[in-house]
Amino acid sequence: MTKTKIMGILNVTPDSFSDGGKFNNVESAINRVKAMIDEGVDIIDVGGVSTRPGHEMVSLEEEMNRVLPVVEAIVGFDVKISVDTFRSEVAEACLKLGVDMINDQWAGLYDHRMFQIVAKYDAEIILMHNGNGNRDEPVVEEMLTSLLAQAHQAKIAGIPSNKIWLDPGIGFAKTRNEEAEVMARLDELVATEYPVLLATSRKRFTKEMMGYDTTPVERDEVTAATTAYGIMKGVRAVRVHNVELNAKLAKGIDFLKENENARHNLS
C-alpha cells in the first residue's frame, strides 16, 4: 500500500505564527522529535526562519545558530530529517551533518547555488511556489510554469527527478481566491512527474475554511480535512504541526484509496 508521508514541523524560532518559542532550544526540540516519532512522523522539517506575515529577516549567522545545534542533536534519530532554508550555506552545513532533504521556500530562486549543493550531497529537495504576488497569467498556470522550470534546473544540476518534490505554496504570494483555485486543481500538479508535498497546516486558508476567527491550534481538524482532500488528489506527503491527527487520518485515507483501486482492478 502506498503510504502518504507525514512531515512534522519543528520550528526552532522565537516568532513562528503557530508555535514560535516552544522548541527553540535543543532539549525541547529533542523531546518534540521523540513525540512526533511516537505519533507516526516520517520526516522532521527543521526551520530557523519564521515565514509569518510581517516577520523580520534573520541573518545567516542567526539562522545557523538556531538550526545547527538542533540538527546535530536529532540527526541520529531513526527518521528522515529535512531543513527548511533558502540559503545554500545553511543547507550545506546541515547536509554535512547528515540531513536527507532541503525544503526551499524559494525553489532555488533566492540562492542559485542551492541545487549544486543538494546534488553534491545526493539529497532530496522540495521546491515551493512563491513570488511577489504579481503575475501575468492565472495562478495555476504560473505555478506550474515556475515550478517545472526550477525542477528542470535542479535536474541539470544533477538532482534526479525522484528526489525533487513540488509544493504549491499555499499561504505564499496568493490571494484567497488563488489559494482556493490551487487547491481545486492540485491534480494538475500531481500529474507532473514529481511527487507533491501539501503544506496547509494552521494557515490562513484553513482559518477561512472555517468562516470565523480561530487560533492556529484550533485549525487542526480543518487542516486534517485538507490532508484528506490532498491525498485523494494524489499528493504524496503533507507538512503538519499535529502529527498524530494527520498520521491517523492519512492511514485511513490510504487504506480506502488502496481498497478502491484494488476493487476497480478486479472489475
Swiss-Prot record:
Its cofactor is Mg(2+). Pathway: Cofactor biosynthesis; tetrahydrofolate biosynthesis; 7,8-dihydrofolate from 2-amino-4-hydroxy-6-hydroxymethyl-7,8-dihydropteridine diphosphate and 4-aminobenzoate: step 1/2. GO terms for biological process: folic acid biosynthetic process; tetrahydrofolate biosynthetic process. Pfam families: Pterin_bind (PF00809). CDD domains: DHPS. Catalyzes the condensation of para-aminobenzoate (pABA) with 6-hydroxymethyl-7,8-dihydropterin diphosphate (DHPt-PP) to form 7,8-dihydropteroate (H2Pte), the immediate precursor of folate derivatives. Homodimer. This is Dihydropteroate synthase. It comes from Staphylococcus aureus (strain MSSA476).
